[in-house]
Amino acid sequence: MENSTTTTEWYENQIREDGCFCMRSMQKAPGYVQKLNWTEKEFTQGLTYIQLRKDNKPVGFIEYALGEQAWRAVHADGYLVIHCIWIAVTGLGLGSQLIQRCIQDAITLGKKGVAVVTNIDTSWAPGPEIFLKNGFRHVEDAPYSFQLYIYKLNQEHSDPYFPDNWVLRLDRFSEGLTILRTHQCPYLEIATHNVIEAAETVGIQPEIIDIRDRSQLMELSPTPYGVFHVICNGELISYHRMTPRSFAKKLTMLYSKS
């Protein structure tokens, strides 16, 4: 335990001992185990994972990485990049506390600032509101409602930026059904199985590409989200988990047009 107040405790980089905040009710599930292993490996590359507990119950977490090692498709060398932030108990300012901790780490480490990829259309990426409250500003947009927000510690520093070849990235997967996945999120194993189940009902065999490192992610990812994508005949179906039925419906519509 790093520090505590009377009721709120901070646990840093103890995911093996304290567990993952997400999917904690399914700790024997393959995705959960893969997340633990992935996170511990990324600790050696500068990843930070902080979990908050209130009265010994998990109430939120934040995960962030060095820009050079971030699992988001954004050029952010010299910055810290927030992967995820989630608060289960609102109204206590816990989310802002976690963001401010990340900013303080950026100062301590001599970084240019903090960057985060947001999206207003899904809960699988954070929304921008809490970052605006904490002094972040919007710098760039990408397809599928992704946006880049930054907190810059020195205005003379260059801004992070998105790649500019999103269409080309999708064109690489112009034939068949492709799943790009990582183990950064514990739900992605379930998401993958849902696609496979849906594909079987339509008579399609998906190709699964496991993204092993940042360089591969930066080369292949068709959105800033980076860690999970389903692409069918060059068209993005999803970058997050969906039910098998929803995937099957989309696949049927796409193949009926071809």
What positions do the PLM features span?
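Conserved beta-strand in the GNAT
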Residues: 51, 57-68, 81, 86
